[in-house]
Structures are given as C-alpha cells and as structure tokens.
Swiss-Prot record:
It is found in: Cytoplasm. One of its GO terms (biological process) is regulation of DNA-templated transcription. The gene is yeeN. GO terms for molecular function: DNA binding. This is Probable transcriptional regulatory protein YeeN.
C-alpha cells in the first residue's frame, strides 16, 4: 500500500497551504460533533476524535475552543453529512464528502463544479464501490512487525502494516480504527501524524498532462467549497 500512502501524504500536503480553509472546515466538524452529543470530548468519542485530527492538522486551540463554545451556547445550525460521486477524464473517479447546514445549496454547488470543471456527477454508489473505506494510522517508527504483533494481541482487524519514509503506516478495517489507536496508546505510543478514515481506491489511473490539468482543477474547486470536507480520487499522478 506504499503508493496509496504516498497519495494520502500528497493530498494532505497540498491542502496545508490553505490554512484558513482547513481551520474553518475543522471548526464546522467540531461544532457538529459537539452538537450531536456532549460538548465534552471526554464524554463524546466522536468529538474527541475530531479534535485529535484537528491537532494533527495544527489547528490552533482557539479555533477548537470557539467551535465547542458555540455548541455549548446553543447554536441553532444543524449540519448534515453527504457524499457526492463523479467522474473526470479518462477513467478518473472522485468522491466528495460534505458537511452542510444547507443541503440544497451544497447539491447545487457540487453539481455546478462538476459541470464547469470537466467532470460528470454520478449517482450514489457509481464510484464508491471502487474504493475501500479504511482506517489509516501513521506515526514515527521503523518496526512494522512489532507494531503488527501489538495490534494482533489487541485483536485489531489489520489490513496491512508498512514502514514508509521513517513512518509506520497502519491500514485497518474502518470499524477498528479507534480500537487500533487505543491499543497503540496502551503500548506507549502517544503521538500520531494521521488517524483518519480514508476512502482508498482499489486501483489507480495515470492521466496525461492535459487531462491531469483538468482533473486537478476539478479537485481544487471541490476542496475550495466551504461545504466539502474531504475529496478522494483514484489518480496516481496527482
């Protein structure tokens, strides 16, 4: 899964320049998680997980606190999760996951982006069946066999454990992501660079420079939309 990890790193790195967008999107996700349960991360597993991911993305504490305080204060916005699937040039596929307080606005915006940026929006399930929902855990390390033993003893359902550029990269069944994190913490591992649920393509395509330019424009436009939280694709050279 080395190439898949490389693509995840590339996507995360590409987003790092747009810090204000990252902060805003995490703010929405934290608020939504806090509203759906207790605004205390120790009593709300979903909120705790989002906050951990926000810290990995270097979201400042004041942004996190502001979103939680808004939920505590009885903010009346309700956010709904969504998923939109579609196609780019020459076998390229894309999934956009959204979190929105206005579903009609989001549908219209996503459809417009696909139409204007050389893509075609598809029906639900038209693309996602070619992706595997996967837990991904990454931290500094160099002994994947030892880590695999830790996870095996904790009965974590692991798909793969690899070493990539000084990092241990673990792929789990999506339902065992939190269990895997807990097992690693119990073994003394406390700092993670990634703990995410990712949609990983089962196979990838490489696009020509011309098609890649079109596809990159489509991905960028989706990522720039305020309601889009994550974008997944199957293009190896992006």
């Amino acid at each position: 899964m080395g190439r898949k990890w490389a693509n995840i790193v590339a996507k995360k790195t590409a987003k790092d320049g747009a810090t204000s967008k990252i902060y805003a999107k995490f703010g929405v996700e934290i608020y939504a998680a806090a509203k759906q349960g207790e605004p205390d991360p120790e009593l709300n597993t979903s909120l705790k997980f989002v906050i951990e991911r926000a810290k990995q993305a270097q979201v400042p504490k004041h942004v996190i606190d502001k979103a939680i305080d808004k939920a505590k204060g009885g903010g009346d916005e309700t956010f709904v999760q969504g998923r939109y699937e579609g196609f780019g040039p020459n076998g390229s596929m894309i999934i956009a996951e959204t979190l929105t307080s206005n579903v009609n606005r989001t549908i219209a915006n996503v459809r417009t982006i696909f139409n204007k940026k050389g893509g075609n929006i598809g029906a639900a399930g038209s693309v996602s069946y070619m992706f595997d929902n996967t837990g991904v855990i990454v931290f500094k390390g160099s002994d994947p066999d030892h880590i695999f033993e830790i996870l095996l003893e904790a009965e974590v359902d692991v798909r793969d454990v690899t070493e990539e550029e000084g990092n241990i990269v673990i792929y789990t069944e999506p339902t065992d992501l939190h269990k895997g994190i807990a097992a690693l913490k119990a073994a003394g591992i406390s700092e993670f660079s990634t703990t995410e649920l990712e949609m990983i393509a089962q196979s990838e395509v490489e696009l020509s420079p011309e098609d890649l330019e079109i596809f990159e424009g489509l991905v960028d436009a989706l990522e720039d939309d305020d309601d889009v939280q994550k974008v997944y694709h199957n293009v190896a050279n992006l």
